[in-house]
Amino acid sequence: MAEFYLKILLIGDSSVGKTSLLFRYTDNYFSEEMISTIGVEYKEKVITLNNRKIALQIWDTSGQERFRSITQNFYRGADGVFFVFDVTNKNSFENIKVWLNEPQVVELNSQKILVGNKIDLKEQRVISKEKMEELGVKINLVSFETSAKTGENVEEIFTKIAELILSNKSEDEVKQLYSKDKQNISIVSEESSGTKINKQCCA
């Protein structure tokens, strides 16, 4: 049984590879035919960090505009957020600031990481590592390059965000991470809104 429960969000434009990152991390699975998320996708993975069992409860949110008002309901209580863009898609990179400035995101007291995905597509790449790091400095976020296809840096980003969350909380705040509210996620209101939720768990 996990000692702590951390709620992690994957946020960004549609088709940047958020779902692929989720499945690569939790199931070590990748498919070129991954279907875009409708609503939200939820999976859980238990890791050991500093000799403690930690459950990462990971929410992959749809980047499609028509689901925006629904998926924002899932932002509440997030401990960590990945802002994901596609290094072959300039618009997805430029839209990071849009995602960062969403009111529901601004209100979050959480650790945030900038993620440039699809670095395996070297010939199609339009956003350099230097440009990504420059943005990271401007918006005060740690930045990582990843490839859901090859698995490069995927495990590292999830470990890093867990480390950041725990290192930036007081002892009392860390104790609050062991919460029944985190274990038994309430999704009744979202389900009644017609949001698709896939709940899966893997240790």
What role is predicted for each listed range?
Residues 1-15, 19, 49-53, 108-203:
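Conserved P-loop small GTPase signature centered on TRAFAC-class small GTPases
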Residues 22-23:
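Post-Walker A alpha-helix
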Residues 26-53:
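Switch I (effector-binding) loop of TRAFAC-class P-loop GTPase G-domains
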Residues 43, 68-73:
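Conserved alpha-helical scaffold flanking the Walker A/P-loop in AAA+ ATPase domains
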Residues 48-51, 72-77, 104-108:
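Conserved catalytic network of the ASCE P-loop NTPase/AAA+ motor domain
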Residues 54-67:
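Switch II (G3) loop of P-loop NTPases
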Residues 57-59, 85, 99-101:
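WD40-repeat beta-propellers
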Residues 78-97, 107-110, 119-126, 149:
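Conserved Switch II/interswitch segment of TRAFAC-class P-loop GTPases
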